[in-house]
Amino acid sequence: MEVITNPGQMQTLMLSLKKQGKKIGFVPTMGYLHEGHLSLIRCSKKENDITVVSIFVNPIQFGANEDFGRYPRDFERDKSLCEKENVDYIFYPSYEEMYPDGFQTYVEVAELSKGLCGDFRPGHFKGVATVVAKLFNIVCPDNVYFGKKDFQQLKVIQRMVKDLNFPVNVVGCPVVREPDGLAMSSRNKYLSDEERESALNISKALFEAKRMFEDGITDPNLIKERVRQIISQAKHLKEIQYVEIVDSNTLKPVDKVKKSDVLAVAVYIGNTRLIDNIEF
């Protein structure tokens, strides 16, 4: 496994591998890898000749009062996890390499960036789309793997790829959960034991919502009300930012719940913002 920090060197290497007919799979991450990331890496290993993992905590997708400074970082740990999974290359650029002086070009996916997390994290998806567009141009992947836990992010990237004709196939992979139901996230590290216990109400609420739908309930308000009830019982709940049921393509709220619609939530447990979702 090789670690590459220079974008130009990375791009040259990837282009030469593609010339040799190699199929490149790419897993973009912000590091502090967990089983969710590893499941993406395994998908890539299965479907491609070369697997690249990028590790870059992207400052332009964090708002002024968000957790950029304290976001967990441990490169040596990430590196050894990647080695165990037989990753071929880690792309690990510095901030200066990605955003040199004078940088002023941004990518914005207008409609899909609105609503859900977009309402609470202005500029977030502009930061995500911009860094991912840059990474696509540097890594030149055939296939790229994103977790469905960040459902809105996945939709934003799919739209960007379509609208800007990126020659890449975007693969959305299922949410990976802890045995007790908690969706895996690098931010889970912030939770105390008691807060982690409280956070279980999130997945509990989602599973209950799915059960209601399977029992024939299609009124989104009834389902959302029940979800709020369950989450509100969490001892360390600080705030429910949103509970929405949206169409999985447009991300617009629905009047009647149908199969493949998505229930998405964002919740503060203590000082930690957690998101999760489930498909009906």
UniProtKB/Swiss-Prot annotation:
SUPFAM superfamilies: Nucleotidylyl transferase (SSF52374). Pfam families: Pantoate_ligase. Beta-alanine binds at Q61. Its main location: cytoplasm. ATP binds at residues 30-37, 147-150, 176, 184-187. (R)-pantoate binds at Q61, Q153. InterPro entries: Cyt_trans-like, Pantoate_ligase, Pantoate_ligase_C, Rossmann-like_a/b/a_fold. It is an enzyme of class 6 (ligase). GO terms for biological process: pantothenate biosynthetic process. It is found in: Cytoplasm. One of its GO terms (cellular component) is cytosol. Transmembrane segments: none annotated. GO terms for molecular function: ATP binding; pantoate-beta-alanine ligase activity. Keywords: ATP-binding, Cytoplasm, Ligase, Nucleotide-binding, Pantothenate biosynthesis. The active site is at H37 (proton donor). Catalyzes the condensation of pantoate with beta-alanine in an ATP-dependent reaction via a pantoyl-adenylate intermediate. Belongs to the pantothenate synthetase family. The reaction proceeds by a bi uni uni bi ping pong mechanism. This is Pantothenate synthetase. The lineage of its organism: Bacteria, Pseudomonadati, Aquificota, Aquificia, Aquificales. The gene is panC.
